[in-house]
Regions:
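Thr-biased low-complexity repeat/linker tracts and other Thr-enriched repetitive architectures
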Residues: 1-251
């Protein structure tokens, strides 16, 4: 990360000089915003959340100006949405759930407008599902399981439509599996083990297919392990130790 940070910092110097010289060029402004975002990602990866927050705040500042100046440009609006999302992630990592919720709500507002305006754009639809998912995560962290369930269900509905429309896209299939896991976690927290088992079983079905199709993808293999583990937890909660042992062994 240190080497990457050095390269990005040098690129940032050049980008800052260019935007100072040509302040009206939106592409140069967007490049500058992107570099702040990259440096924020590096800082976050090194667990330096304060530095990350500073970089993401600079990204947001530029994104807000561009989105205001070019309200009909979906990319500028999407950049703004992503900036709120990144700051929400930092606030969440710092356990500041109020701030995180505020950022994620702004992200959702933009994502909803874009998804409504461009219903056939899978990336914008996927972005909307992620926005719901993020808010669901905050509600879950606060033990507001009803709100979490509502947000996760909205995310799942979008992901199911996308997975049906693009059956060969592994990321869209994976998103669906993650939604089932999230809903299973909520059902488990509410002690509804039958519902939880049903959700986890659906996640397992998808994870199995993906892990088989992409045996060299570590994330998909990990997803499969998580699915088995979750089903093991349910079996254990139901005192079915034989089944639990079987699931844990596969995990």
């Amino acid at each position: 990360y240190k080497a990457a940070e050095g390269y990005y910092a040098k690129a940032l110097e050049i980008s800052e000089r260019l935007t100072e010289k040509f302040p009206e060029d939106p592409n140069l402004q967007r490049d500058l915003s992107s570099l702040y975002n990259d440096l924020g990602d590096i800082a976050k990866a090194m667990n330096d959340y304060k530095a990350a927050e500073g970089y993401y705040a600079k990204t947001l500042e530029i994104s807000e100006k561009l989105a205001e100046k070019y309200p009909e440009d979906p990319q500028m609006q999407r950049d703004l949405s992503a900036s709120y999302n990144k700051l929400g992630g930092i606030a969440e990592a710092l356990n500041d759930y109020n701030a995180a919720e505020g950022y994620y709500a702004k992200d959702l507002e933009i994502s909803e407008k874009l998804a409504e305006k461009y219903p056939d754009d899978p990336n914008l639809q996927r972005g909307l599902s992620i926005s719901y998912n993020k808010l669901g995560g905050i509600a879950k962290a606060r033990n507001d399981y009803n709100a979490a369930e509502g947000d996760y269900a909205k995310a799942l509905a979008i992901r199911e439509r996308l997975a049906e429309k693009y059956p060969e896209d592994p990321e869209l299939q994976r998103g669906r599996s993650i939604s089932y896991i999230n809903l299973g976690d909520i059902a488990k927290a509410l002690n509804d083990y039958t519902a939880a088992e049903g959700y986890y079983a659906k996640a397992l079905e998808i994870s199995k297919r993906l892990a088989e199709k992409y045996p060299d993808d570590p994330n998909l293999q990990r997803d499969l392990s998580i699915s088995y583990n979750k089903l093991g937890d349910i079996a254990e909660a139901l005192n079915d130790y034989k089944a639990a042992e079987g699931y844990y062994a596969k995990a």
